[in-house]
């Protein structure tokens, strides 16, 4: 029968290989599912997101030449000098 399973397939699924990397990373997974009470590090994440948004806006303004920088060339030709 094509839908039947063999004992060999079940044996392969039940035995798992323990690797040194898995053993080293196991302590990092011990806190899985636990949530710290309160806001935790959310304000810090918000601060870094705001700083990253400001960084992206500055890069966009430089690219669009909206932000004029004296003595800074924004063409490929000036980069080759």
From Swiss-Prot:
The modification Phosphothreonine is found at residue 3. Its main location: plastid. InterPro entries: PSII_PsbH (IPR001056), PSII_PsbH_sf (IPR036863). GO terms for biological process: photosynthesis; protein stabilization. GO terms for molecular function: phosphate ion binding. It is a single-pass membrane protein. HAMAP family: PSII_PsbH (MF_00752). Belongs to the PsbH family. This is Photosystem II reaction center protein H. It comes from Nephroselmis olivacea (Green alga). The lineage of its organism: Eukaryota, Viridiplantae, Chlorophyta, Nephroselmidophyceae, Nephroselmidales. The gene is psbH.
């Amino acid at each position: 029968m094509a839908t039947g399973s063999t004992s060999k397939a079940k044996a392969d699924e039940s035995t798992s290989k323990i690797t040194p990397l898995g053993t080293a990373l196991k302590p990092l997974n011990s806190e899985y599912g636990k949530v710290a009470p309160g806001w935790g590090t959310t304000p810090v994440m918000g601060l870094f997101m705001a700083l990253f948004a400001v960084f992206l806006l500055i890069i966009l303004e430089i690219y669009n030449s909206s932000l004029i920088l004296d003595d800074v060339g924004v063409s490929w030709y000036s980069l080759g000098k």
